[in-house]
Structures are given as C-alpha cells and as structure tokens.
C-alpha cells in the first residue's frame, strides 16, 4: 500500500498549508495507514507529528529534506528515520544543518538507521555519492531513464490538501519573498493530498517494485521516546544529596534558625526531595541565584509555591521564612503528586542575557539552550499581509485592521462588526483576499524565542531533541511542551523589571543619601509603608497599581502586612465578592463563622474566609486526617473541577472525618465550602512572596519618594509624572545649558530629559550635553553640526523653552530660524554681517507655550496656565485635595477628557469628565439636564470653574456638576465699522462653536458689545471667513 512520505507541513514556513491536525484527519479519510512529514532542514513538528499519528492510529514516518554540498554540487536528499536510532540521527543532522555546520563527512557518520532518497528531479546518472540511496519517483517520472541498479521508491510531494489551496500557497510565497503576486512564480500543481487507493493502484500498475520497496521500507518503522528525567549533575565530585544537606544546614545556621521546628521541617523536605530525585535541581537553582547575587543583582523574594519550601529559604532561593509564615511545602512538592518542582527564577530584566551566558558557560553549549516558540499569522497580520498583495493602500489597511479587536478572530469580527463586514463585501477582490487571510490565520509565520524558558540536560541535548543556532546560545527546535515531554529540565528565567527598579533604588539611595539599605531586611510592618498602602497610593507598585487594586486597598485599608497579602488574593474574580465580609468581620460588624474549633486557627487570620489554597489543604489535614500530600491532591481536583475525582475524595473526606469523631453533617457542609473556595483560592506562598516585593518597592516610595520617581521615570515606559505631581513634586523649567539626557529629580523638582523629545536623535542630544555651555542662540547654531541644522530637530528645542535664557520670546526665535541658519552658515565669509538682525514678533501665550510643551515632551514645563488663572482669580474655589464628601464646592480645573453616553431610560446624552487642578485628578458627572445646557462650552484642554456636589463612589470622591463657567480670561475681539454685516458675522461665528467669549467694538459709534449667547473656537479659518466683514480681529 502507498505511504505518503514527502509532506511539507506549515513548519516549512509559508511553503505549505498542511497543518498536523487536519493532516491526520484527511489521511484517515483518504485511506492511509502510514504517513510521513519531510520539512526542509527542520524538525519543528517532529514530536507532535509522531505523537499525533500514534493517537490517531496512524504509523508515523519521520523525514527530513536537506541539501548538502558534495564535490562542488548541491545534492538534494530526503532522509527517512527507519527506527528510534535513525530518529536520533536526524536530530543531529538537522541540528548541524540549522547551525550551518553540516558537511558530508559528518553526514556519513550519522546514517545508521536512516534511509536516503534522492528525488528523480535531482538525480542524474553522473551523480556519485558515498552512501546507498533510493531514487524517488512520482507519476511523471520517465522510468526509462532511471538507473536499473538503483532501487526506486514512490515519492510524491504534498504541500496542500486540495487544488483550491494553490492560490493561497501562491499568496504565502509572495508574502515570504516580499513580492507582489504578479512577481511571484506560480505554485506547482498536483501537490495536493491524494487518495491512497488511487495512488496504490497507479504504482501497482506502473512501478510495482517501487511500491514493494516502499512497503518494505516502512513496514517496521517505530519510534520510542525516552521520557525519563535527565537532570544535569551539579557536581560530579560530590553526592548531590550530601551537598544539598550541607548547604541547607549551613544556610539555617547563618540565619540563626538551627533549632526546632526548623530542623525537623528541613529533614522532612530533604527526604522527599531526595526520594523524588531532585537534589541536583535545587543545587542548580541555588547556583544560578548565587551567580546573580555575586554580581550584586537583587534576585527578589521568590515566586510561586516554592516560597513554601524551607530548603529554598535556607538556600536563599526565596526570601520568605515558610515556618514563621505558615507556608506549606506540600503545595510545592509531595510524593503523592509526582511532578517536576517548578521554581521560576525572577531576575532583573536588564541582566537576563548575562544569566544565559552563565548557563551556557557553566553547563556547556551542548547541554543548554533557549526554547523556540512559533509566531503565527494573527488576524491583523493575516489581513495586512494578504490585502497588501492585492494592492490595498496603507491607509485602508490601517482603517480595516483597527476594526479587529484584541481577542477577535477573522470569523468573529466578520460576524459581529457591521462596518468590517461592509468593507469586506464592498469589493470582489476584498472577499477573495479575506478568504485567503482566513485560510492562513493561525498558521506559523516564523520562529521566535520563548520569553523565559531554558532547557538543560546531563548529556548532549541533541541526544534527545533537535537544536538550531541562536545569538546567545542554541535554541531548541521543539516547543516547551515537547522539550518537557522528553524528560528534559525546563526552567523559566523571568526578567522582572520590578527587581530592576528595586535594585536601582537601593543603589541611588546609597549614592544620594549615603545609606546602605538591605532590601531583604526591610521591615514588612513598617508603619509609613503600611500607611501608603492604606491610602491606595500605589501607582508604580508591583501588583497594586491598577485601579481595581487601588480601590480595594482604599476599602480594606490594610493595617498589617498580612492584610496586604490578603488584598492580593481578594483582588481576583470570585474572591472579590467577599471583600465586604472581610472588612466587616475585621471591624467586628459581622459574625465570624469558624465552623469548628479544630480549624479555627486556620481560618482566624482571614476572618473565616478561605482565601488561600493552603487553607483548604490544612483543613483537610486537621479535620479529616489527610496527609498534606493527599490534601494537595484534593486541592488540585477541586481547582480543576474534576467531578469524578472530587466525588471519590468527598467520600474519603467524610469517612476520615467521621473516624476522627466529626459530625457527618458538619463534614459535608465543610467539604462543600472548601469546594466552593478552592475554585478561586490563591496560592498563599506566591501571594506572600510577591506582596513582599511590592512592599519593598512601596518602602522606597514612602521613605525616598524622589528616588522612587527618578527610577520609575527613567526605567519604566509608563507615565509616572502625574503621580509625582500629585505627590507635590513640580516640573522645573530647564535650559539648553541645564537639561539632562534622562529625567532627574532633585529637591522635589522634576527635570525632564532630552530623551523625551520625540524625534530628537540620541547623538544630537549627547552632542548638546558635551558641548555646553552655550552663550546665545547664535552661538548654539554656529556650533551645531550641519547634519543637525534642520528645523525638525531645532524647533522642538525652541518650543519647549530651552533658549528662554537667551531670548524669552519663543515665537521670535522660530520666525527668525531660517534667517539664523543662513547667518551662521555665512559667518566669516566676505559678505557676512557681524551680527544677526532679529525681526520682532508677538510671543505665544502662556497657554500656547504649555500646550506645546505637553505635545513635545508629554508634560508642561513652564508655569501651568491654571496657576496663572488662579493667581488672578477673584472667585473663591477649593483645591481638589481639600474636597469633602456631601458638600457643595467650586473647583478651578482643566478638562483632560470627556466621555459622552446616552442614558438607558431616556436615551438623553450625559457626560463624564476627567479633570485636574495641576495637583489632583477628579471625576465629574454631568447629568442630561446640565449637559444640555453646557455641552457647547465643554472642550478638552480648556479651563473652567465647576460648581457641584461632592459624592463618594468606590472610595473615590467625585463631583456631580450643576454649573459650568469658563475660566479663561482671553476673548476674541472684533473691530467693525458699523452694524451693516451683523447677520453675516453672527452666522460665521455660529459655525465655529467653542469656549472663547466674543466682544465686538463698533468704530463708528464707539459701541462695545460682549456677546452672551455665542462663544467660538478661534482658528485661522474663522479669521479668513470674517475678513470681508471686519476691520480687525484680536485674540487676547
């Protein structure tokens, strides 16, 4: 019977449409018993192909297509792994090929268990190679020209399922080669997956011996994977068990904990670790963290359930004492649930590459590798790649892809988005392109590297998996699942920027204050830091900077570190429903049900609410006599909602509880309660470790706010300026002679850096810093290299006021810039002037300057216009920070954003405003009646007095606005001769609604009128429209 060997899969990137799952399905439909894959150079899909075949009752045949140079000729070879030995040889051959190291000698040394096929298209009778081979023939091969001494074998290339797929593959080739469809060669026909019986009949008729050769070749093929654990040996000169025991004992003695119950707990953990064969694993993790600390890196407090291990604490893998804080080792590791311990290593993100190099050098480049991932055609990428080849312009592509949501597939967005569907259906070619995009959506596009994963092995990795070359170290061809399934140690090196922040803060405190802070010794009950959490002042604090967490902190107002840990756990779906109960019970306003005195100590810290997975385990242990290992199995069954397992566990729980003298009714009720909480209960060990890191960050914010904001602004991409301003920091005006490159904070002043100026070349910024001081605008421009004498680079420097120290009129410098550049370039020539003749002009307003600064660097650096308005104001108003709930107040603010909605009942419009008074933000609501009155006045960025009632919602003050009044003092003045054109002027003004009051002065009768019903948005277009009817317009 025919077997399909030469099938290219989607892992021959953009050269096939054969995905594995559909391949199995179609192969069975077409009557195949044996199928193969033969991707070019790589084995990315090999493991999943073999396992998938076995699951689907198909015989897998693993192949590999390579080209190899021999006697100055590239020879195309198809290789077939005939058995497990051949499979391992392919791993090595593919690795050599994907590393650029494959040569004929190496190839010939690795042919045991491999059959070689040379396709008839690449064969000639002049070809002489140092190995035996078959000649692969298809339906179109002229058999009369074949070497009669060589064995023939049926070999048919498959790249798609049906002829209809040829157009899609043509598109993939165009995308791959970055060509238009017209420039891309047509796809070969007859490469679809054909019916097995038809092909068998064809070869039986035309080439029966070849068919027999194929049957003989594949008949005994079978692959066996070695799934045994292959941990590297940490130290071949000493027993890992003894070394781990020595190190942990020394670690506890160093911490002053060589006493009970620590000694018993340590022995218990060491026995389990040794029995499960993980001694080397702990030593490897210890070694990696030791390396980081030897470099002075802050490695954090640990993460996940590993924080429940005393061995990990003794080795300084974690920074949490699990005995003191009642954390469970069995949640991490127990003999009743055999699985690899999972210690993810957090490290400062800026040093991750150094850890990779250490692993490579310490354990060997053949024994360690990063892990591959596959980037796929997402819906937006598929649309963009395909529609581009249909000639769709960029602006149309952008508009179309904007309609695709983050979680959308092409099918779902087409179904739910009317506008998307209308675009697709508007043209025939769009419908065709969309069909192709849907066909390739989800297919691999290229390889990438796992963000965290590293694999290590005791022997060469290529004995188990294929590799390819990478920048810092080798990269696996198998994904993380396949790597672990082959018994290899996968570890996650997680670059955590918060560790970088903490380390940099520690270093800056030492530099600026001469104070050496031991981060791990920070008191987790520090009153000042606890107060910061209680206020919800946690912008920039790991795990607590989102609005949901901030609001939760304001409600809970944690009074001790344990309540911060609880807040982490309550800030989750399900658990958050019990926040009110938690608070009321803590305040004595609600009865605490502890169910049974024997489990009261477990539930008391969380006021009778099961917040943590460990509580479920402890209750099972204390109430029903379960071992902690068995209790962990119960927890897992509950969290995974394994009904069959849970039913069995429930009966066991009830029987064991009754055996201990518990009432059956109480036991059943308790089990149901445990079952409910286990679904969303949090890992307490993880919550504790990450809350400790959050507390350490918050400690710096509470005690050294200038250091905190300096580091956050320079090492984080997020915006912390607003938060700093709310904490009474001020943005300082800088000059060309003082501006730093990165942001700097000194004495509550924020000095914005040159790095914030969009589009400013870094080299130019460095040149400015190296060349200063400058004496004048002319001096600066004279010394500026010609390549930087461009308005696109110079104008932003002028607009943000860097030359105010020489000439405070920014508009004047801008208007003279062209002349200045001519002047400085002619300076010294025969016809040059000795000094520049400036042309005067009116400067920007305070508001305009502030807006330009915001636009260019993201924040205003000069005096805020609102402060100017406040200083001149004759009206009484209250700062946002002094507002009191359930009171009437007037605030002077700037509108940041306006969100308009329609009410569900009447369908009328209302608005939500986000406003600020330069120090604090406030949410403002305008209900339909007020919004209808003031909607024409409201504009983002403008200044207003708002009067209203202060309410509290979600522990945040907000205003229900009753009155709106413009705060800006500028007006639009019109000078007209008489009343002749009043109607035309009124009509024009009405077409430019805004927030600026209008005053008309009539020259003939010296009459001045302030318009009460018209306010405008002043633009050049408005000025042009008015020109025929007025003598002059002035905005001041």
Curated annotation (Swiss-Prot):
EC number, UniProt record? 2.7.7.7
Q: Which is one GO molecular function term here?
A: DNA-directed DNA polymerase activity
Keyword check for RNA-binding, yes or no.
Answer: no
Q: Cellular component GO terms, alphabetically?
A: cytoplasm
Q: What is this enzyme's catalytic activity, as reactions?
A: DNA(n) + a 2'-deoxyribonucleoside 5'-triphosphate = DNA(n+1) + diphosphate
Give GO BP annotations, semicolon-separated: DNA replication
Highest taxon of source: Bacteria
Major location (coarse): cytoplasm
Looking up Gene3D superfamilies in the UniProt record yields:
1.10.150.870, Bacterial DNA polymerase III alpha subunit, thumb domain (1.10.10.1600), Metal-dependent hydrolases (3.20.20.140), Nucleic acid-binding proteins (2.40.50.140)
Query: Looking at its record, which EC class is this enzyme?
Result: transferase
NCBIfam families named in the record:
polc, PRK07279.1
The entry's family comment says: Belongs to the DNA polymerase type-C family. DnaE subfamily.
Q: How does it assemble?
A: DNA polymerase III contains a core (composed of alpha, epsilon and theta chains) that associates with a tau subunit. This core dimerizes to form the PolIII' complex. PolIII' associates with the gamma complex (composed of gamma, delta, delta', psi and chi chains) and with the beta chain to form the complete DNA polymerase III complex.
* Job description of the protein: DNA polymerase III is a complex, multichain enzyme responsible for most of the replicative synthesis in bacteria. This DNA polymerase also exhibits 3' to 5' exonuclease activity. The alpha chain is the DNA polymerase.
Q: What is this protein called?
A: DNA polymerase III subunit alpha
Q: To which species is this protein native?
A: Streptococcus pyogenes serotype M1
